[in-house]
């Protein structure tokens, strides 16, 4: 982080619940995110995806099995996501897990509530993933100094 952009760390005393609420509000308002995955050759690839978010900060997205991100995720589950753009943004690192069984039904229902037009892709074999958060950073560059804080999540 650039200390000059951040100024004094006034968010050091902000409790975790307040930080999470600010982050959650931004994610809730967003429909699109940039998802970055790693290829089997250890190069990065990024794609725009529609996202939903659960109370526990797990992100939900869908893809088709013939897309590069799907193949990448079968090989390496580590991902990063950028949500929101200027002036406020969330950087999110986590682990992507393909959904199945009862969990798939629950997450798919929630995602289709936010994106009803995505139902048409069911017949094409749409796949759903959840991303379990490890680390999240919030940045708002419209504030002076910039508002920047991080939240870490327990690794399960």
Model regions: which residues?
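Short beta-strand segments
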Residues: 30-65, 71-73, 79-83, 91-93
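Hydrophobic alpha-helical segments typical of transmembrane helices
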Residues: 19-22, 69, 107
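Short, basic/aromatic recognition patches
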Residues: 13-32
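Generic structural signal for secondary-structure transition and capping sites
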Residues: 31-32, 78, 116, 136
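Alpha-helix boundary recognition
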Residues: 27-28, 74-75, 112
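Charged, gly/pro-rich active-site loop segments
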Residues: 2-15, 89-156
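Short, solvent-exposed cationic patches
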Residues: 13, 66-77, 118-121
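A short local loop/turn or secondary-structure capping micro-motif enriched for an aromatic residue
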Residues: 53-55, 68-71, 99-101, 146-148
């Amino acid at each position: 982080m650039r200390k000059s952009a951040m100024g004094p760390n006034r968010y050091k005393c902000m409790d975790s619940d307040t930080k999470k609420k600010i982050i959650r509000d931004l994610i809730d308002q967003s429909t699109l995110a940039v998802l970055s995955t790693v290829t089997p050759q250890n190069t990065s690839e990024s794609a725009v995806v529609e996202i939903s978010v659960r109370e526990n900060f797990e992100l939900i997205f869908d893809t088709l099995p013939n897309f590069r991100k799907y193949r990448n995720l079968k090989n390496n589950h580590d991902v990063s996501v950028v949500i929101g753009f200027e002036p406020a943004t969330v950087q999110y690192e986590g682990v992507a897990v393909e959904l199945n069984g009862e969990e798939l039904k629950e997450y798919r229902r929630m995602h289709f509530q936010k994106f009803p037009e995505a139902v048409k892709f069911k017949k094409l074999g749409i796949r759903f993933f959840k991303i379990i958060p490890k680390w999240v950073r919030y940045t708002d560059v419209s504030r002076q100094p910039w508002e920047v804080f991080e939240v870490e999540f327990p690794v399960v």
